Amino acid sequence: MLVNVDATLPKRGLTLIVGRSGAGKSTLLTLIAGLSEPTSGTLEVGEEAETTRTTPAAERARRTGIVFQFPERHFLGRTVMQELTFGWPTSANAFASRRELAYRMNDALHAVGMERVALDTEVRTLSGGYKRRLALAIQLVRNPRVLCLDEPLAGLDWQTRAELTALLDELKRDRAVVVVSHDVEEIQPITDRAFRMTTHGALADVSDELAGARARAYGEASDAFPSFD
């Protein structure tokens, strides 16, 4: 249960949400993404963020992409192409829409570093890191204003984690990226705003605390190198 959640997220940049397991972090992501409805209060996504009405779930879903923890468990297609084009319109008069989606797909594959992966590649043969990239590309094709990610680094080796962190740093430049993660040390350097969720589901802004920790870490790292003055 989420209680007294009060936060405004920037249109661009990466917002990190931390907290103990079971606090409701993943529930918050599903609310933002339009997969569930709040029982009270308001939740606005988009231009009407100054109004007092909740953005309808269908509209939130249209404006928001979400990548679940271990997204590979939710893949439905056999090949990369089937995954990327799942749900595209198939009617005879949908040519213009499909062409636009194809352009977006090309851009998305480049954005996540999969432009060299053949579209007929079977998804099951991809590495864990490339499966995460594919999950991101699927959402980017939809061109969401908000991109939510639940534990994006979970279960990956250190090199893949570093590559995905760098990718998120790029993606946040054009949209709001909301990340739920226990991997604070790795996400912290690219975080613009941070919240801690309590066991009661309330959010506390810890952006200044995070910035202070980052500054101290930078100072300690600098002290580790000899001075050449």
Where would I find each of the regions flagged by the language model?
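Conserved H-loop
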Residues: 175-180
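ABC ATPase NBD Q-loop/coupling interface
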Residues: 42-59
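Conserved ABC ATPase signature
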Residues: 122-126
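Helix-to-loop junction immediately C-terminal to a conserved catalytic motif
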Residues: 33
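Conserved ABC ATPase "signature" region
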Residues: 99-117
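ABC-family nucleotide-binding domains
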Residues: 157
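Catalytic Walker B motif of ABC-type/P-loop ATPase nucleotide-binding domains
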Residues: 147-151
